[in-house]
């Protein structure tokens, strides 16, 4: 397994690169560069005429990409992956891409850096933005949002069963002292949560929900997946690693939707070609989860799921 820094171990690395790298001279997009683990492994598998375009909205990821500056096959673009269609248009890569990789979620360096505000285990500013140069912070949103809006976010994006109770406590507590720190929020959630789950901090779901909301994560995933259909050439691979059920359900639905032919009433005299006219993808194998050895090495990989699809037509 390739490690790009002492802090970061790429998840499902061998499995994802094996699925992705079908042409050693192809053009590939790593839509979630992070600290470059998957990009490095991919470049190691490719020939001199290959091309890898990496995207990331995190300024720290862009800085980490300097390690690849001497490789002429590599290009980094500072943009969220939801802008994938714009990147494809700008680089004239529609229907030209051999494989697109998405490694969703938060990287270990982001979680471990208290100043980013993603972790309830480390006290830091309540920020949670993937791109720290723009947008509303988690603290700003929590200190202004209506109780019902907070409750909806916690329930919808965190599947938090105590969403209303936590939202009410947030609104009540912020009147005395606005939320500014991760520890402040985590301790409040622990205080008001009536049930403590074994091996799970009470703030886990709330922090996930707020992060997804602040970064519009699910909306960005949907936009990027749709754009991938424009970019992939025939037989090109879509490879997606997700880390929680909301992401995985979204990816699974997307692949299933585009793997089905036209839905017609039974008994109609139509050819197989006509029935498959709207089919854009074909699922490749079953979902892949990390083995015991990987989970022991990197416990954060436990919830990860890898899904693979192949582009089946090019029009």
From Swiss-Prot:
Q: What's a Gene Ontology MF term here?
A: rRNA (cytosine-N4-)-methyltransferase activity
What keywords is this UniProt entry annotated with?
Answer: Cytoplasm, Methyltransferase, rRNA processing, S-adenosyl-L-methionine, Transferase
Biological process according to GO? rRNA base methylation
| Disulfide bond annotation, renumbered to this chain | none
Q: What InterPro entries does the record tag this protein with?
A: RsmH, SAM-dep_MeTrfase_MraW_recog, SAM-dependent_MTases_sf
Sorted alphabetically, the Gene Ontology cellular component annotations on this record are: cytoplasm
The record's subcellular location field reads: Cytoplasm
- Family, similarity comment: Belongs to the methyltransferase superfamily. RsmH family.
HAMAP family noted in UniProt? 16SrRNA_methyltr_H (MF_01007)
Query: Can you say what this protein is called?
Result: Ribosomal RNA small subunit methyltransferase H
User: What lineage is on file?
Assistant: Bacteria, Pseudomonadati, Pseudomonadota, Gammaproteobacteria, Alteromonadales
By which gene is this protein encoded?
rsmH
